[in-house]
Amino acid sequence: MELLRAENIQKVYNTRAGGKPCRALAGVSFSVEAGEFVAIMGASGSGKSTLLNILATLDTPTSGEVFLEGQSMKQIKGKNLAAFRREKLGFVFQDFNLLDTFTVRDNILLPLVLSRTPLAEMEQRLKPVVASLGIEPLLEHFPVEISGGEKQRTAVARAVINEPRLILADEPTGALDSRSSQQLLNIFDRLNEQGQTLLMVTHSSLAASHARRVLFIRDGKLFAELCRGDQSQQVFYDRITASLSMATHQGGESL
């Protein structure tokens, strides 16, 4: 079943008076099925983060339309948009976006607090999430007291606590060491195996190889796609790196 669809997304930024407009996205179209794990790969400035922000309703396209479960995001306004984002989407960012004055517990529960979820239900949801991510002992700590990997696991807990239809991840391993990156990717694998739909923007071939499908973006356009099928993560990683090498050899920009 189709969960997300982007139709001919274009984004143009106007520069200062007299300057030439900057086209960040040039007619991007694709869809994501429920339960898929899709990665979008591209170099810095390729348009991948702009695309993610539009899919997340954090930015609006100059033209084109995004649908989630058949509902056009263009038709959702104001407070309804904030509620839609809070209830349907989960976010994992490179820099964690945790509130320093909130404990780990409070950071995780924030989406439920904003949704006015009853306290008993919040606690009921919290326990299995933090147990599965191994952060139960950290609940009363503040972000400054925990490691980068622990911060990102806290961010994942916050993303899944509201049981979103779609998790959007923007360079989630970018600020992590190799060990913490692998732990996070294993968590994404497990979430996907449990039926969670994920869309991840990354420049890392290793991170992308954990997805089931990879879309490649350059100069605001999708130019290639790889599907993992029954291949192992290692074999898919080799295919991704080979595809990137070929794209560079043919005049494309290295990722």
Model regions and ranges:
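Conserved ABC ATPase signature
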Residues: 142-146, 150-152
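Conserved ABC transporter NBD signature motif
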Residues: 64-72
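Catalytic Walker B motif of ABC-type/P-loop ATPase nucleotide-binding domains
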Residues: 167-170
